[in-house]
Amino acid sequence: MTIADNKKAFFDYFIEERYEAGIVLEGWEVKAIRAGRVQIKEGYVVVRDAEMFLIGAHISPLQSASTHVKPDPVRTRKLLLKADEIKKLIGKVEQRGYTLVPLNLHYTRGRVKCEIGLAKGKKQFDKRETEKQRDWQREKARIMKGGKE
């Protein structure tokens, strides 16, 4: 079940590969995510010391959050991947033009997971071309729907 999607990532990048990663979360973050108070549009993934971290994802704390814990909505969160996946991703990210972006947050067997994508940035004309394709698909569907009535 999807919790949050990063639609901006599909507009700004060509997604070449996808990986599912676990996230190290605190208790209040899990409660807030279950309540749907998460936004990953501004998030990105970095590699530090052969570990992956999610930066810029915003999890708004609930009003009933613990009094003794000071919630930080945009703290850096560690991503959990297998060692061979991390090595493969490090090799690809070091190539020019590749980056890692969070695509969505979802549940897998009750755990919150983050789907990350190995992405290559789109140029402005690529974005315009994608928009034209999307408009054409929409127009084609409208024509087909109108023709069946």
Curated annotation (Swiss-Prot):
Does this entry carry the keyword Iron-sulfur? no
State whether keyword Transmembrane applies: no
List the Pfam families: SmpB
Supply one GO molecular-function term: RNA binding
What broad class describes the main subcellular location of this protein? Answer: cytoplasm
Q: Which UniProt keywords apply?
A: Cytoplasm, RNA-binding
Extract the SUPFAM superfamilies matched here.
Small protein B (SmpB)
Where is region (Disordered) located? 123-149
Gene Ontology BP terms: trans-translation
Localization in the cell: Cytoplasm
Q: Indicate the family of this protein.
A: Belongs to the SmpB family.
Question: What's this protein's function?
Answer: Required for rescue of stalled ribosomes mediated by trans-translation. Binds to transfer-messenger RNA (tmRNA), required for stable association of tmRNA with ribosomes. tmRNA and SmpB together mimic tRNA shape, replacing the anticodon stem-loop with SmpB. tmRNA is encoded by the ssrA gene; the 2 termini fold to resemble tRNA(Ala) and it encodes a 'tag peptide', a short internal open reading frame. During trans-translation Ala-aminoacylated tmRNA acts like a tRNA, entering the A-site of stalled ribosomes, displacing the stalled mRNA.
Name the record gives this protein: SsrA-binding protein
Q: What is the lineage of its organism?
A: Bacteria, Pseudomonadati, Pseudomonadota, Betaproteobacteria, Burkholderiales
Quick one: which gene encodes this?
A: smpB
